[in-house]
């Protein structure tokens, strides 16, 4: 029987409503099941932390609430590991404690015990947690990450495996010191104009210049008004911060890759130029590349067979290019350390006086005498005991942050208890380890004398480890210490430095630098605002 036309519209409307309701009910069921599954999964994860040492723990939200409460009292860009260390202090947590940040991260175990840190890094030879350094791609090529993934890479590497020693770096000191004349002239000009400058930026340029000298054996002109090197370096590294945000990275990545390719091309060209300039086929001016070329010409690298006496193989050239990018970028992390050293010395004038006295007694009391001393006897740097101690104490107070490891074992023993650490991120927390009062008395105080030979209270074994040990240790630590000594020696003789933050600037906890609190807004941990400073010529 046909439905009257007058009834068609109501029936159609009813049918559509029933269809929509049915579809809605169909969609609600899987969504509800998904929500139930997520709640059960989260509850299961949270229960795993029930009997573990940890800060106060929310049954459903884990440790997000307590970290967020702490963050509300701090500057927004503060370095995240400092927040964890403040929580550790507030709740007097032990040297091993756990954080539950699921689902953003796997369970994290924070370690600040030197013996346990030694076992994980040196005895178990655990590797760095996957993806830690990949955040620097494309500034550092993927080739470099594949290289360092090899446990034995430091033995066969065509640069690190040849002449990467403190004795070899000391031979480069005279040229490094000469290359800093331009920096000293720049500081002199800023003093005349009473100009405020960014210390972290100056230190970065200085370390870039000295690292380039060590690697290529040539001056990079990093303090020239339009330096090709500093421009290419900053263009390749500035996007690192924005790219850490997964929502911004897709928009940043195309231009970042373009700038990275330009940076790598500049390095590649310099490597080729260095090889072509080595006319005598032997290392003349001491440099890492000169030593590597000497071995290469003798066909001494099985992984990189020589093409001819006059040419570099493509593989060898690319290895040296990726290594150069990694070294130049990695070395500049020392800029934050040297910046904090200037800040701490300004805050402790008595220590600064002792340091200048040491510089004068060992190398002389003016620029010319220091440069002459370093030219004739570069090993004099080894006699700067207090300078070395100042740098070690600065690294203790302002380390580069925790080292994340992936342990090969499924359990970890500490103080008679066994912990299940399967699928855990193991974080060796230098910020916590270096400020333990039982290891470093009065740990928040700047006291470089504790590192002098014959100190009344010796530093416990494995307690000071800013460069880390075992797999993933900093291969450039000897070069970094030499560079920072040279910079302190040349600058403190002529200049006084003082921080110049605006009154309205954000301020972090005083124990972490106050206005110069450590941020995560650089390649690595960086003083807030790059540590603005004013420089004055010293009164003679």
UniProtKB/Swiss-Prot annotation:
<dbReference type="InterPro" id="IPR050121">
    <property type="entry name" value="Cytochrome_P450_monoxygenase"/>
</dbReference>
<feature type="transmembrane region" description="Helical">
    <location>
        <begin position="20"/>
        <end position="40"/>
    </location>
</feature>
<dbReference type="GO" id="GO:0043386">
    <property type="term" value="P:mycotoxin biosynthetic process"/>
</dbReference>
<dbReference type="InterPro" id="IPR002401">
    <property type="entry name" value="Cyt_P450_E_grp-I"/>
</dbReference>
<dbReference type="InterPro" id="IPR001128">
    <property type="entry name" value="Cyt_P450"/>
</dbReference>
<dbReference type="GO" id="GO:0016705">
    <property type="term" value="F:oxidoreductase activity, acting on paired donors, with incorporation or reduction of molecular oxygen"/>
</dbReference>
<feature type="glycosylation site" description="N-linked (GlcNAc...) asparagine">
    <location>
        <position position="17"/>
    </location>
</feature>
<dbReference type="InterPro" id="IPR036396">
    <property type="entry name" value="Cyt_P450_sf"/>
</dbReference>
<keyword id="KW-0408">Iron</keyword>
<keyword id="KW-0812">Transmembrane</keyword>
<dbReference type="GO" id="GO:0016020">
    <property type="term" value="C:membrane"/>
</dbReference>
<comment type="similarity">
    <text>Belongs to the cytochrome P450 family.</text>
</comment>
<comment type="pathway">
    <text>Secondary metabolite biosynthesis.</text>
</comment>
<keyword id="KW-0349">Heme</keyword>
<dbReference type="GO" id="GO:0004497">
    <property type="term" value="F:monooxygenase activity"/>
</dbReference>
<keyword id="KW-1133">Transmembrane helix</keyword>
<comment type="function">
    <text>Cytochrome P450 monooxygenase; part of the gene cluster that mediates the biosynthesis of the indole diterpenes penitrems. The geranylgeranyl diphosphate (GGPP) synthase ptmG catalyzes the first step in penitrem biosynthesis via conversion of farnesyl pyrophosphate and isopentyl pyrophosphate into geranylgeranyl pyrophosphate (GGPP). Condensation of indole-3-glycerol phosphate with GGPP by the prenyl transferase ptmC then forms 3-geranylgeranylindole (3-GGI).</text>
</comment>
<protein>
    <recommendedName>
        <fullName>Cytochrome P450 monooxygenase ptmG</fullName>
        <ecNumber>1.-.-.-</ecNumber>
    </recommendedName>
</protein>
<feature type="transmembrane region" description="Helical">
    <location>
        <begin position="325"/>
        <end position="345"/>
    </location>
</feature>
<feature type="binding site" description="axial binding residue">
    <location>
        <position position="474"/>
    </location>
    <ligand>
        <name>heme</name>
    </ligand>
</feature>
<keyword id="KW-0472">Membrane</keyword>
<dbReference type="GO" id="GO:0020037">
    <property type="term" value="F:heme binding"/>
</dbReference>
<dbReference type="GO" id="GO:0005506">
    <property type="term" value="F:iron ion binding"/>
</dbReference>
<keyword id="KW-0479">Metal-binding</keyword>
<dbReference type="Pfam" id="PF00067">
    <property type="entry name" value="p450"/>
</dbReference>
<keyword id="KW-0560">Oxidoreductase</keyword>
<keyword id="KW-0503">Monooxygenase</keyword>
<keyword id="KW-0325">Glycoprotein</keyword>
């Amino acid at each position: 029987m046909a439905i009257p036309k007058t009834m068609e519209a109501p029936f159609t409307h009813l049918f559509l409503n029933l269809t929509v309701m049915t579809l809605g009910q169909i969609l609600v069921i899987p969504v509800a099941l998904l929500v139930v599954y997520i709640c059960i999964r989260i509850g299961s994860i949270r229960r795993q932390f029930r009997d573990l040492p940890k800060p106060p723990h929310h049954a459903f939200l884990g440790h997000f609430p307590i970290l967020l409460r702490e963050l509300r009292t701090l500057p927004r860009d503060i370095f995240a590991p400092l927040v964890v260390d403040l929580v550790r202090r507030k709740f007097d947590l032990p040297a091993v404690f756990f954080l539950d940040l699921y689902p953003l991260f796997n369970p994290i175990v924070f370690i600040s015990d030197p013996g346990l840190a030694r076992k994980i890094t040196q005895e178990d030879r655990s590797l760095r947690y996957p993806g830690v350094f990949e955040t620097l791609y494309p500034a550092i090529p993927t080739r470099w990450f594949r290289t360092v993934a090899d446990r034995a890479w430091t033995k066969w590497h065509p640069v690190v495996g040849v002449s990467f020693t403190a004795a070899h770096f000391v031979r480069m000191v005279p040229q490094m010191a000469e290359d800093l004349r331009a920096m000293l002239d720049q500081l002199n000009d800023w003093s005349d104009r009473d100009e405020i400058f960014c210390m972290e930026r100056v230190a970065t340029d200085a370390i870039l210049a000295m690292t380039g000298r060590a690697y290529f054996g040539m001056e990079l002109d990093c303090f020239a008004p339009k330096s090709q090197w500093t421009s290419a370096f900053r263009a390749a590294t500035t996007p690192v911060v924005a790219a850490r945000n997964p929502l911004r990275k897709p928009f940043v990545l195309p231009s970042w890759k373009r700038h990275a390719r330009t940076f790598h091309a500049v390095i590649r060209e310099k490597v080729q130029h260095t090889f072509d300039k080595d006319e005598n086929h032997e290392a003349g001016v001491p440099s890492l590349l000169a030593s590597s070329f000497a071995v290469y010409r003798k066909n001494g690298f099985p992984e990189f067979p020589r093409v001819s006496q006059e040419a570099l193989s493509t593989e060898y050239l690319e290895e040296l290019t990726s290594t150069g990018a990694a070294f130049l970028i990695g070395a500049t992390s020392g800029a934050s350390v040297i910046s904090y050293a200037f800040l701490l010395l300004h805050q402790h004038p008595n220590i600064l006086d002792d340091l200048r006295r040491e510089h004068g007694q060992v190398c002389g009391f003016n620029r010319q005498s220091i440069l002459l001393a370093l030219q004739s006897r570069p090993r004099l740097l080894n006699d700067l005991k207090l300078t070395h101690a100042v740098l070690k104490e600065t690294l203790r107070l302002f380390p580069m942050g925790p080292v994340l490891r992936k342990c090969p074992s499924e359990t970890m023993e500490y103080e008679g208890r066994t912990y299940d650490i399967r699928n855990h991120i193991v974080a060796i927390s230098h910020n916590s380890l270096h400020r333990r009062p039982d290891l470093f008395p009065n740990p928040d105080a700047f006291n470089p004398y504790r590192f002098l030979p014959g100190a009344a209270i010796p530093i416990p074994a494995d307690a000071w480890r800013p460069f880390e040990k075992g797999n993933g240790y900093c291969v450039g630590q000897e070069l970094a210490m030499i560079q920072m000594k040279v910079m302190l020696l040349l600058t403190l003789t002529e200049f006084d430095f003082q921080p110049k933050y605006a009154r309205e600037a954000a301020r972090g906890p005083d124990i972490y630098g106050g206005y110069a609190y450590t941020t995560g807004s650089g390649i690595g941990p960086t003083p807030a605002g790059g540590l603005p400073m004013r420089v004055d010529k010293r009164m003679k």
